[in-house]
Design a protein with these regions (language model features):
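Intrinsic-disorder/low-complexity peptide segments enriched for small residues
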Residues: 10, 32-33, 110, 116, ...
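Acidic, low-complexity, intrinsically disordered interaction modules
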Residues: 41, 47-119, 124
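Compositionally biased, intrinsically disordered low-complexity regions
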Residues: 16, 21-24, 32, 66-70, ...
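Generic detector of low-complexity/intrinsically disordered segments
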Residues: 14, 36-37, 96, 114, ...
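Short intrinsically disordered terminal tails
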Residues: 1-17, 84, 126-132
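Short terminal alpha-helical segments
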Residues: 7-43
Length: 132
């Protein structure tokens, strides 16, 4: 018997169906940029994970960008070592902000969720620096 209360991971195509053409195009561009960050700074395995779970990773990436826009202290250079307490803080924050069934995607990949969040902060920072 199927559990009707259980949600599933949303596909990006489903999200884009309810968006106008411009927003849909922006989502495609941002997902492409997110994957470039993962490919640039991370392992092939993690890149493939993010490709497989685009919508979930896109959500975490976007959360990083929004966090940076609200407080630029969230930014950490993805090439630099990270304070373990900061990493734990972000992982705890993500796990409490994302619904449990969606967060389950990252069980065993919590550090990747943290890094995708950081890539989101870095993405917005690069955009801001490019505009100045």
């Amino acid at each position: 018997m199927e559990d009707n209360n259980k949600t599933r991971e949303v596909e990006l195509d489903e999200i884009k169906e309810v968006c106008d053409e411009q927003t849909s195009s922006m989502i495609d561009e941002t997902v492409s940029d997110m994957l470039k960050f993962v490919q640039r700074y991370d392992s092939k395995e993690n890149y493939e994970f993010c490709q497989k779970h685009e919508a979930t990773c896109f959500g975490v990436f976007t959360m990083g960008g929004v966090a940076y826009q609200n407080d630029n202290r969230f930014w950490v250079n993805p090439k630099e070592p990270v304070d373990p307490d900061y990493k734990e803080y972000i992982i705890d924050m993500l796990s409490s902000m994302i619904s449990q069934d969606i967060w389950n995607t990252f069980i065993g990949h919590e550090e990747l969720a943290f890094r995708v969040f950081l890539y989101g902060t870095h993405y917005i920072r690069e955009e801001e620096l490019g505009r100045s």
